[in-house]
Amino acid sequence: MEEEVKDIWHVYSDGTRADIPFDTTEDKVYTWNSVAISAETAGVKVLVLTINDTHLHCLTKGDTERVAHFKKVLRQRLANRFTRIHFVCNPVRTRKEAKAKFMYVYRNCLDFYKKLPGEYPWGSGNIYFSEHNSNPADHRIGDYSLREQYRMFRTRMKLPEGWMVDTYGRILSDSFIDYVSVEQLFVSVRSFIAFLYVRREDEVALKQEIHRNYLESRSIQDLRRIGNEYCVQACGKTLVKVNVRVRLAIAATMIREGIAGRSASLAKALLLKPDDLTLLI
């Protein structure tokens, strides 16, 4: 029987969205710091974090209430800078799953990054089973005035004075990422390396599972909001004012762009009958 784990969660946004919310270095710094600040606000530990141009993934540690608070604060902070971003928060049940999900997040850059994941600048870095040496160019948050901190981090919250930031103003990984819990999870360097090398078919299956969970997590209200936005863009009217043919076209677009799957929830959100979706080829 597999060993169970508690209070570990996979939090992520949609990797198939058409736009690029985290495009620039400034966008990534803001998003990175937002994860750190949201976790500190909610009393949640971050185990691993990766930010790509289109989405982010992290593994967090905390009880249900704290992780829900983390998700809410993070969504609010990102909404101040980007378009609305939907997050999924799935519990991790076993130690084996925790290791696999950790490596999925850690390796997430490999679809487009040609070096080892520990070298990816917008990932956790080489902080696990390694020494943590500060760079002379880095600074303690406590060295900045409260006014400077607000300008850099856009929060009134008092952040830990010992946290370190780099020349971009980004909070360093080993200041807020709980590498100790990760090392306890894997136990040894040998185990960490073994999980780092994932079979391609296993990674594809996990990616499909994660995307399926994302699609299933969307509420009817969320799908209807998106459907109305597409409908207004297409014909200047909301869903309630257009015919079934137009609604089906909107459904086809949302399915094609990976926003939703063929489901009763999508049909209900777009004011269709479940059988109507069978008309889509």
Give residue ranges: language-model regions.
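Short beta-strand->loop micro-motif that forms the acidic, two-metal-ion catalytic signature
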Residues: 55-63
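Short Pro-Cys-Gly-centered "Cys-loop" motif that presents a nucleophilic cysteine in a tight turn
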Residues: 1-51, 63-281
